[in-house]
Protein backbone atom coordinates (compact mmCIF):
# COMPACT_ATOMS: atom_id res chain seq x y z
CA UNK A 1 0.00 0.00 0.00
CA UNK A 2 1.43 3.36 -1.04
CA UNK A 3 0.71 6.59 -2.86
CA UNK A 4 -2.17 9.05 -2.55
CA UNK A 5 -4.88 8.05 -0.09
CA UNK A 6 -7.86 10.36 0.43
CA UNK A 7 -9.46 10.84 3.89
CA UNK A 8 -12.98 11.48 2.67
CA UNK A 9 -15.28 14.20 3.90
CA UNK A 10 -18.63 12.84 5.03
CA UNK A 11 -21.28 14.65 2.96
CA UNK A 12 -24.40 15.66 4.87
CA UNK A 13 -27.84 16.84 3.86
CA UNK A 14 -29.42 19.95 5.38
CA UNK A 15 -31.01 17.77 8.09
CA UNK A 16 -27.52 16.40 8.98
CA UNK A 17 -28.24 12.92 7.65
CA UNK A 18 -25.48 11.34 5.54
CA UNK A 19 -25.79 12.16 1.84
CA UNK A 20 -24.97 8.82 0.24
CA UNK A 21 -25.61 10.08 -3.30
CA UNK A 22 -22.92 12.73 -2.83
CA UNK A 23 -20.63 10.09 -1.32
CA UNK A 24 -21.07 7.90 -4.38
CA UNK A 25 -20.27 10.81 -6.71
CA UNK A 26 -17.19 11.72 -4.71
CA UNK A 27 -15.73 8.21 -4.63
CA UNK A 28 -16.35 7.77 -8.36
CA UNK A 29 -14.66 11.13 -9.02
CA UNK A 30 -11.59 10.17 -6.98
CA UNK A 31 -11.26 6.71 -8.49
CA UNK A 32 -11.57 8.15 -11.99
CA UNK A 33 -8.69 10.51 -11.13
CA UNK A 34 -6.62 7.49 -10.12
CA UNK A 35 -6.10 7.88 -6.37
CA UNK A 36 -4.55 4.85 -4.70
CA UNK A 37 -6.75 4.71 -1.61
CA UNK A 38 -10.14 5.74 -0.21
CA UNK A 39 -10.50 6.26 3.55
CA UNK A 40 -13.86 6.69 5.34
CA UNK A 41 -14.52 7.70 8.97
CA UNK A 42 -11.55 10.07 8.94
CA UNK A 43 -10.84 13.26 10.87
CA UNK A 44 -11.80 15.27 7.79
CA UNK A 45 -14.91 13.08 7.65
CA UNK A 46 -16.03 14.28 11.10
CA UNK A 47 -15.93 10.77 12.54
CA UNK A 48 -16.31 12.10 16.09
CA UNK A 49 -19.74 13.46 15.13
CA UNK A 50 -21.00 10.10 13.85
CA UNK A 51 -22.88 7.58 15.96
CA UNK A 52 -21.49 4.07 16.42
CA UNK A 53 -24.02 2.65 13.95
CA UNK A 54 -23.40 5.45 11.45
CA UNK A 55 -19.69 4.64 11.49
CA UNK A 56 -20.51 1.05 10.56
CA UNK A 57 -23.02 2.11 7.92
CA UNK A 58 -20.60 4.59 6.33
CA UNK A 59 -17.86 1.95 6.33
CA UNK A 60 -20.18 -0.53 4.61
CA UNK A 61 -21.34 1.96 1.99
CA UNK A 62 -17.77 3.06 1.27
CA UNK A 63 -16.73 -0.55 0.78
CA UNK A 64 -19.63 -1.07 -1.62
CA UNK A 65 -18.73 2.00 -3.68
CA UNK A 66 -14.94 1.57 -3.81
CA UNK A 67 -13.94 -0.75 -6.63
CA UNK A 68 -10.51 0.34 -7.90
CA UNK A 69 -8.57 1.77 -4.96
CA UNK A 70 -7.46 0.38 -1.62
CA UNK A 71 -10.23 0.79 0.94
CA UNK A 72 -9.43 1.96 4.48
CA UNK A 73 -11.75 2.56 7.44
CA UNK A 74 -11.13 4.71 10.49
CA UNK A 75 -11.93 2.76 13.66
CA UNK A 76 -10.56 5.03 16.37
CA UNK A 77 -12.30 5.75 19.67
CA UNK A 78 -11.56 6.55 23.31
CA UNK A 79 -12.99 3.11 24.17
CA UNK A 80 -10.58 0.24 23.41
CA UNK A 81 -13.35 -2.33 23.12
CA UNK A 82 -15.34 -0.13 20.77
CA UNK A 83 -12.21 0.11 18.61
CA UNK A 84 -12.01 -3.69 18.59
CA UNK A 85 -15.63 -4.02 17.48
CA UNK A 86 -15.28 -1.40 14.74
CA UNK A 87 -12.00 -2.94 13.57
CA UNK A 88 -13.51 -6.44 13.41
CA UNK A 89 -16.43 -4.96 11.48
CA UNK A 90 -14.00 -3.40 8.99
CA UNK A 91 -12.46 -6.83 8.42
CA UNK A 92 -15.89 -8.44 8.03
CA UNK A 93 -16.91 -6.01 5.27
CA UNK A 94 -13.65 -6.53 3.38
CA UNK A 95 -11.67 -3.37 4.13
CA UNK A 96 -8.01 -3.55 3.13
CA UNK A 97 -6.87 -1.84 6.34
CA UNK A 98 -8.02 0.22 9.28
CA UNK A 99 -6.64 3.56 10.45
CA UNK A 100 -6.71 3.90 14.23
CA UNK A 101 -6.08 7.23 15.92
CA UNK A 102 -4.59 7.19 19.40
CA UNK A 103 -7.14 7.72 22.20
CA UNK A 104 -8.15 11.34 22.71
CA UNK A 105 -9.67 13.52 25.48
CA UNK A 106 -7.94 11.80 28.44
CA UNK A 107 -4.16 12.19 28.67
CA UNK A 108 -2.44 8.78 28.63
CA UNK A 109 1.05 7.53 29.39
CA UNK A 110 3.09 5.76 26.71
CA UNK A 111 2.46 2.43 28.42
CA UNK A 112 -1.31 2.89 28.15
CA UNK A 113 -1.11 3.83 24.47
CA UNK A 114 1.04 0.77 23.76
CA UNK A 115 -1.42 -1.48 25.59
CA UNK A 116 -4.41 0.03 23.77
CA UNK A 117 -2.99 -0.67 20.32
CA UNK A 118 -1.63 -4.07 21.35
CA UNK A 119 -5.02 -5.28 22.59
CA UNK A 120 -6.67 -4.19 19.34
CA UNK A 121 -3.96 -5.78 17.17
CA UNK A 122 -4.23 -9.07 19.07
CA UNK A 123 -8.02 -9.27 18.79
CA UNK A 124 -8.63 -7.94 15.27
CA UNK A 125 -6.94 -9.75 12.40
CA UNK A 126 -6.69 -6.98 9.81
CA UNK A 127 -3.86 -4.64 8.70
CA UNK A 128 -3.73 -1.63 11.02
CA UNK A 129 -2.28 1.82 10.32
CA UNK A 130 -1.56 3.82 13.45
CA UNK A 131 -2.66 7.46 13.35
CA UNK A 132 -0.67 10.14 15.16
CA UNK A 133 -2.30 13.57 15.34
CA UNK A 134 -1.03 15.24 18.53
CA UNK A 135 -3.07 18.39 17.91
CA UNK A 136 -6.22 16.32 18.54
CA UNK A 137 -5.18 13.13 20.37
CA UNK A 138 -2.51 11.60 22.58
CA UNK A 139 0.88 11.71 20.84
CA UNK A 140 2.45 8.39 19.83
CA UNK A 141 6.10 8.29 20.84
CA UNK A 142 8.38 6.88 18.12
CA UNK A 143 9.67 4.21 20.49
CA UNK A 144 6.07 3.05 21.01
CA UNK A 145 5.60 2.93 17.24
CA UNK A 146 8.77 0.86 16.97
CA UNK A 147 7.68 -1.62 19.65
CA UNK A 148 4.23 -2.00 18.11
CA UNK A 149 5.67 -2.51 14.63
CA UNK A 150 8.13 -5.15 15.80
CA UNK A 151 5.69 -7.03 18.05
CA UNK A 152 2.55 -7.01 15.87
CA UNK A 153 2.81 -8.02 12.22
CA UNK A 154 -0.66 -6.68 11.43
CA UNK A 155 0.38 -3.15 12.46
CA UNK A 156 1.64 -2.24 9.02
CA UNK A 157 2.29 1.49 9.18
CA UNK A 158 1.51 4.93 10.54
CA UNK A 159 -0.20 8.08 9.35
CA UNK A 160 1.64 11.01 10.90
CA UNK A 161 -0.22 14.32 10.99
CA UNK A 162 2.72 15.80 12.85
CA UNK A 163 4.36 19.10 11.92
CA UNK A 164 7.89 17.83 12.54
CA UNK A 165 10.53 16.58 10.13
CA UNK A 166 12.43 15.16 13.08
CA UNK A 167 9.47 12.96 13.99
CA UNK A 168 9.07 11.79 10.39
CA UNK A 169 12.78 11.04 10.17
CA UNK A 170 12.65 8.95 13.33
CA UNK A 171 9.62 7.05 12.01
CA UNK A 172 11.57 6.22 8.87
CA UNK A 173 14.22 4.61 11.07
CA UNK A 174 11.55 2.06 12.06
CA UNK A 175 11.51 0.99 8.40
CA UNK A 176 15.17 0.05 8.74
CA UNK A 177 14.18 -2.60 11.30
CA UNK A 178 10.97 -3.64 9.56
CA UNK A 179 11.22 -3.18 5.82
CA UNK A 180 7.49 -3.51 5.06
CA UNK A 181 6.43 -0.87 7.62
CA UNK A 182 4.72 2.06 5.88
CA UNK A 183 5.11 5.72 6.78
CA UNK A 184 2.48 8.15 5.47
CA UNK A 185 2.16 11.86 6.12
CA UNK A 186 -1.22 13.30 6.97
CA UNK A 187 -0.10 16.82 6.05
CA UNK A 188 -0.27 17.80 2.38
CA UNK A 189 2.68 20.18 2.71
CA UNK A 190 5.01 17.34 3.78
CA UNK A 191 4.06 14.97 0.95
CA UNK A 192 6.99 15.59 -1.40
CA UNK A 193 9.47 15.95 1.45
CA UNK A 194 8.46 12.60 2.93
CA UNK A 195 8.82 10.90 -0.45
CA UNK A 196 12.37 12.22 -0.79
CA UNK A 197 13.20 10.85 2.67
CA UNK A 198 11.94 7.38 1.79
CA UNK A 199 8.31 7.51 2.91
CA UNK A 200 5.44 5.69 1.28
CA UNK A 201 2.88 8.38 0.49
CA UNK A 202 0.26 10.56 2.07
CA UNK A 203 -3.26 10.44 3.51
CA UNK A 204 -4.13 14.07 2.82
CA UNK A 205 -7.31 16.12 3.05
CA UNK A 206 -6.71 18.49 0.10
CA UNK A 207 -6.84 15.44 -2.17
CA UNK A 208 -10.62 15.52 -1.66
CA UNK A 209 -10.85 18.44 -4.09
CA UNK A 210 -7.42 18.56 -5.81
CA UNK A 211 -6.26 14.94 -6.18
CA UNK A 212 -4.62 15.68 -9.50
CA UNK A 213 -1.83 17.74 -7.90
CA UNK A 214 -1.02 14.99 -5.38
CA UNK A 215 -1.01 12.40 -8.16
CA UNK A 216 1.17 14.60 -10.37
CA UNK A 217 3.68 14.97 -7.52
CA UNK A 218 3.63 11.20 -6.99
CA UNK A 219 4.10 10.43 -10.68
CA UNK A 220 6.80 13.07 -11.18
CA UNK A 221 8.70 11.70 -8.19
CA UNK A 222 8.44 8.12 -9.45
CA UNK A 223 9.66 9.26 -12.88
CA UNK A 224 12.57 11.11 -11.21
CA UNK A 225 11.32 14.40 -12.64
CA UNK A 226 12.27 16.18 -9.45
CA UNK A 227 12.16 19.71 -10.86
CA UNK A 228 8.51 19.23 -11.80
CA UNK A 229 7.74 17.57 -8.47
CA UNK A 230 9.21 20.54 -6.60
CA UNK A 231 7.13 23.01 -8.64
CA UNK A 232 3.98 21.06 -7.86
CA UNK A 233 4.88 20.72 -4.19
CA UNK A 234 5.15 24.50 -3.93
CA UNK A 235 1.69 24.82 -5.45
CA UNK A 236 0.33 22.32 -2.95
CA UNK A 237 1.84 24.25 -0.04
CA UNK A 238 -0.02 27.35 -1.22
CA UNK A 239 -3.29 25.41 -1.42
CA UNK A 240 -2.90 24.29 2.20
CA UNK A 241 -3.44 27.90 3.27
CA UNK A 242 -7.13 26.98 3.34
CA UNK A 243 -6.47 25.23 6.67
CA UNK A 244 -5.30 28.46 8.29
CA UNK A 245 -8.26 30.39 6.92
CA UNK A 246 -11.00 28.01 8.07
CA UNK A 247 -11.98 26.95 11.58
CA UNK A 248 -11.62 23.21 10.91
CA UNK A 249 -10.25 20.74 8.36
CA UNK A 250 -13.78 19.73 7.37
CA UNK A 251 -14.94 23.31 6.87
CA UNK A 252 -11.87 24.16 4.77
CA UNK A 253 -12.22 21.12 2.54
CA UNK A 254 -15.98 21.26 2.09
CA UNK A 255 -15.86 24.95 1.18
CA UNK A 256 -13.09 24.23 -1.33
CA UNK A 257 -15.26 21.50 -2.84
CA UNK A 258 -18.20 23.89 -3.07
CA UNK A 259 -15.91 26.47 -4.72
CA UNK A 260 -15.01 23.89 -7.36
CA UNK A 261 -18.68 23.13 -8.02
CA UNK A 262 -18.76 19.67 -6.46
CA UNK A 263 -22.23 18.36 -5.45
CA UNK A 264 -21.34 18.60 -1.75
CA UNK A 265 -23.40 20.76 0.60
CA UNK A 266 -21.55 23.19 2.91
CA UNK A 267 -22.92 21.39 5.97
CA UNK A 268 -21.02 20.18 9.04
CA UNK A 269 -22.43 18.17 11.92
CA UNK A 270 -22.67 20.09 15.20
CA UNK A 271 -20.70 20.99 17.21
CA UNK A 272 -18.69 21.94 14.10
CA UNK A 273 -19.87 24.92 12.08
CA UNK A 274 -19.24 25.79 8.47
CA UNK A 275 -17.39 29.07 8.04
CA UNK A 276 -19.17 32.06 6.53
CA UNK A 277 -18.99 34.03 3.29
CA UNK A 278 -15.77 35.89 4.08
CA UNK A 279 -13.85 32.65 4.66
CA UNK A 280 -15.51 31.02 1.66
CA UNK A 281 -14.40 33.87 -0.62
CA UNK A 282 -10.79 33.56 0.58
CA UNK A 283 -10.83 29.82 -0.03
CA UNK A 284 -12.42 30.32 -3.44
CA UNK A 285 -9.59 32.68 -4.42
CA UNK A 286 -7.04 29.95 -3.64
CA UNK A 287 -9.01 27.32 -5.56
CA UNK A 288 -9.46 29.64 -8.55
CA UNK A 289 -5.73 30.51 -8.50
CA UNK A 290 -4.91 26.82 -8.83
CA UNK A 291 -7.44 26.32 -11.63
CA UNK A 292 -6.06 29.33 -13.54
CA UNK A 293 -2.52 28.06 -13.09
CA UNK A 294 -3.47 24.69 -14.54
CA UNK A 295 -5.08 26.31 -17.59
CA UNK A 296 -1.95 28.39 -18.21
CA UNK A 297 0.24 25.28 -18.08
CA UNK A 298 -1.84 23.42 -20.68
From Swiss-Prot:
Q: Which SMART domains match?
A: DHDPS
Q: Please name the catalytic residues of this protein.
A: 43, 105, 131, 159
Does Signal appear among the keywords? no
Alphabetized UniProt keyword annotations: Cytoplasm, Lyase, Schiff base
Q: What EC number(s) does the entry state?
A: 4.-.-.-
Main localisation, per the record?
A: cytoplasm
Does the keyword Lyase feature in the UniProt annotation?
A: yes
Q: Which InterPro entries match?
A: Aldolase_TIM, DapA-like, Schiff_base-form_aldolases_AS
Any one GO MF annotation of this record:
2-dehydro-3-deoxy-phosphogluconate aldolase activity
Record localization: Cytoplasm
Q: Where are the transmembrane segments?
A: none
Single GO BP term: small molecule metabolic process
Cellular-component GO terms for this entry: cytoplasm
Q: Which PANTHER family does UniProt cross-reference here?
A: 4-HYDROXY-2-OXOGLUTARATE ALDOLASE, MITOCHONDRIAL, DIHYDRODIPICOLINATE SYNTHASE
State the oligomer form and interacting partners. Answer: Homotetramer.
Which family does this protein fall into? Belongs to the DapA family.
Name of this chain's protein: Uncharacterized DapA-like lyase PF0657
